[in-house]
Amino acid sequence: MTFDRDEIRSCMLFNGVTDSETEDFLKRHPCKIRRFDKGDCVITREELSENIGVVLEGTLGIYSDSYYGGHAMVGIGGRDYLFGFIAMFYNHAHSITSLYSRGCRVAYFSVPTGQTPVDFISTTSPGIISNIFDALT
């Protein structure tokens, strides 16, 4: 699905960021938007490092492996919930195993294969990095 740049700019990732910084980020991390019906799998642990995901509308359930071998819901992410490659920046990165839609639209920003968190930080504008850390704290 193509995306509306104004809609993308309205998500918290780009709060207070200039148009040129936004465009630079979009060139480095191409965007696609997907709509998910309730119960659809949005992302699995194996896919976490491939994209940066931002919930634009609706909610998703956050699941982790349970002690008994199944999945347990550990939270709900609403508008502006960040996930995916971003997970490496916080403590629970390896505890999230999957995200399931409760009816949502998500923007995915591609992360180049092999890009490390250090590469990401060094090539991303300080405003976007600040917004990411604000969202995670």
Located regions from the model:
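Cytosolic regulatory regions built on CNB/CRP/Popeye-like sensor folds
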Residues: 1-137
